[in-house]
């Protein structure tokens, strides 16, 4: 996995109602983060997540217009502030956008944007330590299973830690951890390349995160811009392969950017990196819950690129399962592990 100081996304524009609800809880959590963290920062400024409420703008093709309108209607029925803009309204709202090949776009006009991931991580870490959590900088190399429980965890240094409940939150390495107990889940690392660039011509106004028909996205990052896409060779990668392909920007991303936003005719890449999505190859949705046979082994895996924005709701759900044995607030039963074993996808279409 990779961490970056660049703000990460928060968006309720999903095709599945439960994912919309998860993101709505995330928005509420992010907005109240400073207040929630205040007890753990006595006499100090609480961490600011710098939420940029600019929204996401999904470009919509003529053949995709009906489905896009239906998604917007569903999202709005749940209280989201998504709006569908036809071609003319889209051009009026974002005059710098090339709309000639678009039917329109769906835009989150409120409570949608991106935030500082490291601020979230550091706040969680500070609060957890204050509550008695011990962080161990080590690697898990083995799990001891007796009867129907994981009893201990072996670390690379040879230490052994006894286990009450094991939560597999290993991101792209989730399958490696599952395999230590003889289990298997369809979660593998998929490479994603990110590029930060400068443009000679600025984009005026409050620019959203634009998701092009090609799958390329771009959003402002201060005076710069962050972009990425889904590579053509989007297959499982080696767990330690973080080599970046710079030609992905030259050959695919830049042409897509220039077509959609003509102001991007002269760009200069300032920074780039490669990270891994923990990609659930069954249905692009997370796996949350206990294994039915190894009863203290819990999954929190496979979020396929939207894990950070779903982490507040999923973390709450994991704690509810551990404390109460059932979901108490948002019912995440559709994410249960049993669908994996039965090969029954719970599909999410809005994955970039």
Show which residues each predicted segment covers.
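C-terminal catalytic lobe of FAD-dependent flavoproteins
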Residues: 117, 255-352
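Short beta-strand to alpha-helix junction loop
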Residues: 21-24, 58-67, 107-126, 241-249
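Mid-domain beta-loop-alpha active-site segment that forms a flexible
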Residues: 105-127, 171-173, 249-256, 303, ...
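A short coil-to-beta-strand element that immediately follows conserved catalytic motifs
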Residues: 51-53, 135-137, 186-192, 262-274, ...
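Dinucleotide-binding Rossmann-like beta1-alpha1 core, especially the glycine-rich loop
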Residues: 2-93, 215-217, 257
């Amino acid at each position: 996995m990779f961490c970056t100081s660049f703000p990460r996304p928060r968006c309720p524009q999903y095709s599945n109602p439960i994912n919309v609800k998860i993101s709505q809880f995330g928005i509420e959590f992010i907005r109240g983060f400073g207040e929630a963290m205040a007890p753990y920062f006595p006499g100090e400024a609480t961490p600011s997540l710098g939420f940029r409420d600019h929204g996401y703008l999904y470009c919509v093709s003529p053949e995709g217009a009906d489905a896009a309108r239906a998604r917007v209607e569903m999202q709005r029925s749940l209280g989201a502030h998504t709006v569908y803009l036809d071609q003319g309204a889209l051009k009026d709202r974002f005059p710098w956008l090339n709309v000639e090949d678009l039917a329109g776009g769906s835009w989150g006009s409120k409570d949608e944007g991106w935030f500082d991931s490291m601020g979230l991580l550091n706040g969680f870490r500070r609060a957890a330590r204050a509550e008695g959590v011990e962080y161990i900088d080590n690697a898990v190399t083995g799990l001891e299973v007796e009867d129907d429980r994981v009893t201990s965890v072996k670390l690379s240094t040879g230490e052994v830690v006894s286990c009450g409940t094991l939560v597999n939150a290993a991101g792209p390495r989730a399958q490696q951890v599952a395999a230590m107990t003889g289990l298997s889940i369809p979660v593998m690392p998929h490479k994603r390349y990110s590029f930060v660039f400068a443009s000679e011509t600025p984009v005026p106004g409050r620019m959203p995160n634009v998701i092009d028909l090609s799958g390329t996205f771009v959003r402002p990052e201060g005076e710069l811009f962050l972009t990425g896409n889904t590579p053509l060779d989007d297959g499982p990668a080696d767990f330690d392969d973080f080599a970046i392909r710079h030609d992905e920007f030259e050959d695919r991303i830049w042409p897509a950017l220039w077509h959609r936003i003509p102001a991007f005719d002269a760009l200069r890449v300032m920074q780039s990196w490669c990270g891994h999505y923990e990609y659930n190859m069954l249905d692009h949705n997370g796996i949350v819950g206990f294994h039915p046979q190894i009863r203290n082994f819990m999954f929190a895996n496979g979020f396929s690129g939207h894990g950070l924005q779903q982490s507040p709701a999923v973390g709450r759900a994991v704690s509810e399962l551990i404390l109460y044995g059932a979901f108490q607030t948002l019912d995440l039963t559709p994410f249960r592990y049993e669908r994996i074993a039965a090969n029954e996808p719970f599909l999410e279409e809005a994955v970039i």
